[in-house]
Amino acid sequence: MGRLIFVSFGLLVVFLSLSGTAADCLSGWSSYEGHCYKPFNELKNWADAENFCTQQHAGGHLVSFQSSEEADFVVKLAFETFGHSIFWMGLSNVWNQCNWQWSNAAMLRYKAWAEESYCVYFKSTNNKWRSRSCRMMANFVCEFQV
């Protein structure tokens, strides 16, 4: 009886320690601060990339950065996965011509502009944002909250 309680307690500890970690992410996705991320080496325009992300998981969108630490994590992940490339993120003015917003409707709090235009991408070699026509093709990073 004591052994059963000990084993049950041990399993409970393991389960609780995995909560909110990569165990909550799909296979091939990486976890950071309660979110799962995956860079995709597929060239898509911004709208097609956003649509693809929404189909990957409930609540999925192109990545949105809420802090420099989160951005550093994703930039490093993208570089380690594919090397030098550019990646769409969820920031655009597609829906409101003058108001930038993340594709998941989060407020824009953290900024790292290099220049302005339509849809925003980042280079996997640094954390500098650039904009370009949303019709251009780029790789992308999807994100969902666990």
Curated annotation (Swiss-Prot):
Q: Which PROSITE patterns match?
A: C_TYPE_LECTIN_1 (PS00615), C_TYPE_LECTIN_2 (PS50041)
The protein's matches in SMART domains, at most eight in alphabetical order, are given as:
CLECT
UniProt keyword annotation of Transit peptide present: no
What GO molecular functions are on record for this protein? metal ion binding; toxin activity
- One GO cellular component, as annotated: extracellular region
Could you say which tissues express the protein in this record?
Expressed by the venom gland.
Which Pfam families does the UniProt record give?
A: Lectin_C (PF00059)
- Keyword terms: Blood coagulation cascade inhibiting toxin, Calcium, Disulfide bond, Hemostasis impairing toxin, Metal-binding, Secreted, Signal, Toxin
Where does it reside?
Secreted
Q: List the disulfide bonds.
A: 25-36, 53-142, 119-134
Q: Check the UniProt entry and state the signal peptide residues, or none.
A: 1-23
- Can you give the residue ranges of the C-type lectin domain? 32-143
Subunit-structure text: Heterodimer of subunits A and B2; disulfide-linked.
Role this protein plays: Anticoagulant protein which binds to the gamma-carboxyglutamic acid-domain regions of factors IX (F9) and factor X (F10) in the presence of calcium with a 1 to 1 stoichiometry.
Reproduce the miscellaneous comment text: Calcium is required for ligand binding.
UniProt lists the family membership as follows: Belongs to the snaclec family.
Q: What is this protein called?
A: Snaclec coagulation factor IX/factor X-binding protein subunit B2
Source organism of the structure:
Trimeresurus stejnegeri (Chinese green tree viper)
